[in-house]
Amino acid sequence: MSEEVSAPARLLFNRWDTSEVTIRDPGIARYVNLNSMMVPHSCGRLTRQEFHKANMLIVERLINQLMRTEVNTGKKQLAIRIVRDAFEIVHQKTKKNPIEVLCDAVANAGPREETVRLKYGGINVPKSVDTAPMRRVNTAVGLIAAGVYSASHKKKKPVANALAEELIAAANGDVKCYSVAKREERERVAKSAR
């Protein structure tokens, strides 16, 4: 008789298990990828095809957004180290899996409603529309990264601490954090344009 040998679980940063994470928002669950990977680095394999961003690990999407600012452009190892340190801080403060905190933050920071401009007879009229789930995830990750940048750039606060605080506040739905405040602002503008 042969014994079944199970493959060892691949943990993110050799520490965090993604199999125990649940996404509470069913609308974005399809677009938040939680496949296990030791180092979140796909080497650009998913960039050439449309909508394959949904197959990218959500942690790598956050890392890529952190690299978009002027000072961090192309510094992926630095961004990976920032996220790894921020996850440690999140775990120390909340005693939860930081990947689950990230998923809750993405669910709370993504706007559900936005406005588009329609042109009627030469006049631009704002119109409220529902946001697509993939755009909600993209916008949420971008707002989290922008909040981290605004909290830490040219300030004494380390980037990892700013990211940890932003993730915890966004996961709790705190309106004082940048990403949730921007989401509320967009939804308020969309509500007035109905």
Swiss-Prot record:
GO CC annotation, single: small ribosomal subunit
What species does this protein belong to? Answer: Methanospirillum hungatei JF-1 (strain ATCC 27890 / DSM 864 / NBRC 100397 / JF-1)
- HAMAP family recorded: Ribosomal_uS7_A
Checking InterPro entries in the record gives: Ribosomal_uS7, Ribosomal_uS7_arc, Ribosomal_uS7_CS, Ribosomal_uS7_dom, Ribosomal_uS7_dom_sf, Ribosomal_uS7_euk/arc
Tell me a Gene Ontology molecular-function term this record carries. Answer: rRNA binding
Query: What's the protein here called?
Result: Small ribosomal subunit protein uS7
Describe its function.
Answer: One of the primary rRNA binding proteins, it binds directly to 16S rRNA where it nucleates assembly of the head domain of the 30S subunit. Is located at the subunit interface close to the decoding center.
Which keywords does the record carry?
Answer: Ribonucleoprotein, Ribosomal protein, RNA-binding, rRNA-binding
Family designation: Belongs to the universal ribosomal protein uS7 family.
GO-annotated biological processes: translation
User: Assembly and interactions?
Assistant: Part of the 30S ribosomal subunit.
